[in-house]
Amino acid sequence: MDDKKRTARYWIAFFILAVFLVILFVWNVNAGSIHLSVSEILNIIFRHQGDATAYNIIWEIRLPRILSVIILGGALSVSGFLLQTFFNNPIAGPFVLGISSGAKLVVALLMIYFLSRSISMGSAAMIIAAFIGSMISMGFVLLVAKKVHNMSMLVISGVMIGYICSAVTDFVVTFADDSNIVNLHNWSLGSFSGMSWGNVKVMAIVVLLTMVIVFFMSKPIGAYQLGEVYAQNMGVNIKLFRIGLILLSSILSACVTAFAGPISFVGIAVPHIVKSLLKTARPLLVIPACFLGGAVFCLFCDLIARTVFAPTELSISSVTAVFGAPVVIYIMIRRQKRN
């Protein structure tokens, strides 16, 4: 494939992702108990005109939720890409390796502690707690990685760590007495509901700053994909680089878990879908495409979660698993055939 065809393919891929993002954005804004026309939605969003009830629903409920889905979905996908690069494993991801579950455990424990004392827990505190949990889980995974050189065993160990963290979290939440604490059960299953503009502001700042650093690391990531020896010859400090990948992926996944709980398979499935669409593994292209792809995938799954059995809302993690798990199965089968 010559350069012109490659460039055209990249433009087409990004155009497709952008179109799906816009379509799903509008669809999500309109989905719910109150249905509005496109013109009414545009008037409410851009001109701040329209029915007071519809205005409040869109501006105070739907828009914060949709923007949260876009930001967190993109962050989770990029986090998965970074972990796949770090472990050189196509099925590595925050959920599979138990990182999301570790973050969930620490956040849940801290939320229970604060709520039992009638103290509100700020967004920053939630992110810090989730980051600590992510790093603890990552520490266990890295210890296993040193002992076990088989990537399949590493993934299995990560899954076991995740199950342990989830079991402890569920145990604590189940036996909580306070009604507010019991409501943590919905968060522990994964949900984008209840997002506020304050939440959006905090997560946007954290994710944006992290993504800027990830973009600056595009060239070292590309060199690392070709092997540690090649990366060292290109002047990459492997030790610092690997620490950077761990920190960045943990920050992104921690931000997602803090606000939406653990969300499965997005970090694994989306990077592979994006690479298949682009037909390249170049980080400079894959990273922004992963962010867009994660946003599109999560918008679609959140739409399904909200509307299929309305007014009952499904766990977002259940929906992402339904659409993401087949991709993982396909990856494993294809890898087995290659071997």
Question: Predicted segment positions?
Answer:
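Alpha-helical transmembrane segments in inner-membrane proteins
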Residues: M1-N339
